[in-house]
Amino acid sequence: MNLKTTLLLIIGGGLGALARYYISGILPVYKDFPLGTLLVNSIASFILGYLYGLLFFGFEVSSEWRIFLGTGFCGGLSTFSTFSYETFSLLREGEYLLAFMNVVANVLVTITLVFLGFILARR
């Protein structure tokens, strides 16, 4: 890995992490449901779907943008570990329905948004 790639990852990941911090801070929990985590994972999924949709449909996206936006920003923005911890916490607190809803919402919403981003890139 060269210096340029390293810097793109550091800057993209740092900006994604900052965005996650502020978005999750605005919407940390809604009636015991971790809405902030769902939102950041959803945004990152849409962006990643759109980015790779552009590539699939033949648009030129430089490797720098893929590294900066895809791996860096989306990687810093999304958070599987927080999602896992919040689900575990809900289970530990006996909030089984909310834990189930959190898993279903994160999986279905994020996959749907990857698909939507991918399709919208075609236009």
From Swiss-Prot:
It catalyses: fluoride(in) = fluoride(out). It is a multi-pass membrane protein. Pfam families: CRCB. It is found in: Cell membrane. The keyword Transmembrane helix applies. Belongs to the fluoride channel Fluc/FEX (TC 1.A.43) family. This is Fluoride-specific ion channel FluC. It comes from Pyrococcus abyssi (strain GE5 / Orsay). The gene is fluC.
